[in-house]
């Protein structure tokens, strides 16, 4: 009996606090749907397709509106002009990342993806400096990608034209490219530890994109209950063990005057700052940063290419045009290089359209304001959660006629030349844009052109029967599972 009385009092206090918060905070925030106590607007938002719900709410409340995922307000930015103003023109004010209970447990506020403040600034600046010194964005990294693509093509030939799921092989290329930069070596595709490492990334992405993970973010108390988030934490622990094993190998052979890879550079930086108690360069930060680099450079790229292959199976006429351009510009025997992209406008347009159409990250993990912000006539307090709906730019019907249709013409002018678009925000925008954007662009071009140079893609069903609907259209657009045949040409 006492337990029920306690729960009743507890719930009453929650409702009172919620209503008080509504009166004192919400009146200055942008408009939005009226939230329910405790639940907020979560019952009004389809967690399986948040971007669709955002579109409907934006039509009613405008491009800047407030919704409650649980008991805390979240300001939603919808539409290219609003996104540009907040993320680019006023990027500093919207540059912090909001932490969920699950991600806070994993990142500990470290690394380059989920950190904020001085840790983020120093770690990101250092990481970019090291990556550039090791050839990121230059011919050096292009050579590494080309070398890894050779292993991919060999693995695809070994399928002998039989049906196969390309997921693992497509993930091997970006993962090994990152590995060569961080660990200074690649892994054989048959390496069981490497296979498990990639599998853990794939599982983590699926869990993060799940409705359960979104509910855990809204209601942290769920974090203490049984659920798939425990699988997420287990996978993270396994990955950290894998990374630590590589770090220890580097520590044993470290040459302070001759760094060979990212780990060496970081360990040397740690050594230089070992007497600085406030140094951001710690072993924990190194482990989390490496995990961030692998996460940013592996799953997004491989899933985009996989989704791209599915679309090329669905639209064989597009595939044929790419292969014609490959034959004309590159030929059958020379391996593709990044200089070729300037002479292949149709292929470039297809790659951009794949990313625009699939909208892999419709709504990135929320940011938060770094200070009190006056934005378009509204007051947004410091620390307020902010959602940037990238779908609203990528699927803007004024910039991209028939945005729900896959059409490479969205990125071609009337003369067939490649046409850039400021609305292309597949990698987000501003200070928190994807750190691996340049690498991802190179990998997508070199992998796709190499595959189509050497293979014909054969679907297992009629192209018109292929379903390209994502299986989890929530925070991530995960492609449906499928198989295809790679027929050597």
Swiss-Prot record:
The keyword Endoplasmic reticulum applies. Keywords: Endoplasmic reticulum, Heme, Iron, Membrane, Metal-binding, Microsome, Monooxygenase, Oxidoreductase, Signal. It catalyses: chenodeoxycholate + reduced [NADPH--hemoprotein reductase] + O2 = alpha-muricholate + oxidized [NADPH--hemoprotein reductase] + H2O + H(+); ursodeoxycholate + reduced [NADPH--hemoprotein reductase] + O2 = beta-muricholate + oxidized [NADPH--hemoprotein reductase] + H2O + H(+). It is a peripheral membrane protein. Heme binds at residue 434. Residues 1-27 form the signal peptide. SUPFAM superfamilies: Cytochrome P450 (SSF48264). Its main location: endoplasmic reticulum. GO terms for biological process: organic acid metabolic process; xenobiotic metabolic process. Its cofactor is heme. Its EC number is 1.14.14.-. PROSITE patterns: CYTOCHROME_P450. It is found in: Endoplasmic reticulum membrane; Microsome membrane. GO terms for molecular function: heme binding; iron ion binding; monooxygenase activity; oxidoreductase activity, acting on paired donors, with incorporation or reduction of molecular oxygen, reduced flavin or flavoprotein as one donor, and incorporation of one atom of oxygen. GO terms for cellular component: cytoplasm; endoplasmic reticulum membrane; intracellular membrane-bounded organelle. It comes from the Eukaryota. A cytochrome P450 monooxygenase involved in muricholic acid (MCA) synthesis. Hydroxylates at the 6-beta position two major bile acids, chenodeoxycholic acid (CDCA) and ursodeoxycholic acid (UDCA) to form alpha-MCA and beta-MCA, respectively. May regulate NR1H4/farnesoid X receptor signaling, as taurine-conjugated MCAs are antagonists of NR1H4. Mechanistically, uses molecular oxygen inserting one oxygen atom into a substrate, and reducing the second into a water molecule, with two electrons provided by NADPH via cytochrome P450 reductase (CPR; NADPH-ferrihemoprotein reductase). Belongs to the cytochrome P450 family. This is Cytochrome P450 2C70. It comes from Rattus norvegicus (Rat).
